[in-house]
Amino acid sequence: VFEAFSLVTNREPISRSVLEAYGFDTSKVVDLACPAFMFEPASTQDIAPFIQGTPIENKEKPTIGFVLCGWNMIQGPFNREDWKDEEFVQYVELIIHIVREFDVNICLMSHSNGFILPPNFKPIKGRDYPIVEQLYRILQKTEIADSVYLMDGLYNPKITKGIIANFDMLISGR
């Protein structure tokens, strides 16, 4: 079936490598940027319930969004569930440095959702959420705990982009 397509678009270079490793002809595969930049953000009014009580709403200090996923970790596979706290050291050090140096708040956020398959279809937090949640737990044991917030909701793409639009800066590995 794969060979019958005249064009296959690909977002992650590793996907091409995986296809090639399994013997697929990738001559019709074209690597492209993630199309998320084309999504329209939700309005400030629409995101209000999702940012209530967060540093984004309070605006006491600049707020930096921080998105982390398995692809950003030093050792894969990206979909592991057994991350050790030691594997987050460089991110912890980076966030501590940013908070100290620039007197900002950090909002940790997952960038993707998952779902339970039909017939019981239900959106759920994606595989990236436990990663940012673990980073949050680690940071809660540091002197900057009060400057770190975990965005723990389940957000659709429009709401996600609306939230991101309200960060003063976004740091993302994706």
Language model segments and positions:
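Active-site anion-handling motifs in enzyme catalytic cores
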Residues: V1-R174
